Amino acid sequence: MKNFIDLFSGLQRAHGCTYVEKKNADGTKIKGKSFVKREPVTEKHWQDHLNGIEPSLGIIPIDENNKCRWGCIDVDKYNLDHKKIINLINNYQLPLTMCRSKSGGAHIFLFTTVPVDASLMRDKLCSISAFLGFGNAEVFPK
């Protein structure tokens, strides 16, 4: 658990929460409610999140020094060919990790070994997002 928490380090004084209000028959989400909770993230928040207990946990990647160690491209396009995206990432040897999101889209992560300026992370992810064909995707950090 500690390695996972360290990997997704971010803002210490607040985090996001999401409740899924409706789901399709196949379990993908239709509608949810998200908000920011102004309290530190605890190990219980992480454990509940990993066990699928709502609310889902949303780590804010920008820390108190305006730095981050990870960022994410949030692709909300559905009927994605996830394997095609993974092959593109691998073919170009991009330092990215992709996973399917709850809604059937994709979360494409970039991790760094040291904290970098949040603006640099965002700029790089916006460029990568456009290169991958998802120029309109939401990018974190914001």
Ranges and model annotations:
Residues 73-76, 80-100:
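Active-site-adjacent loop/helix surface patches within enzyme catalytic domains
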Residues 13-19, 94-98, 135-137:
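Short secondary-structure junctions
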Residues 73, 95-121:
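Histidine-centered divalent-metal-coordination microenvironment in nucleic-acid enzymes
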Residues 60-62, 96-103, 138-142:
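Short beta-strand
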Residues 82-91, 111-137:
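Helical (often loop-to-helix) elements that flank the catalytic cores of nucleotide-handling enzymes
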Residues 53-54, 66-68, 91-93, 102-105:
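Short, well-ordered loop/turn elements at secondary-structure boundaries
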Residues 1-70, 79-85:
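DNA replication initiation on ssDNA origins
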Residues 55-57, 70-71, 96, 106, ...:
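A broad, low-specificity signal marking well-ordered, structured residues that form hydrophobic/aromatic
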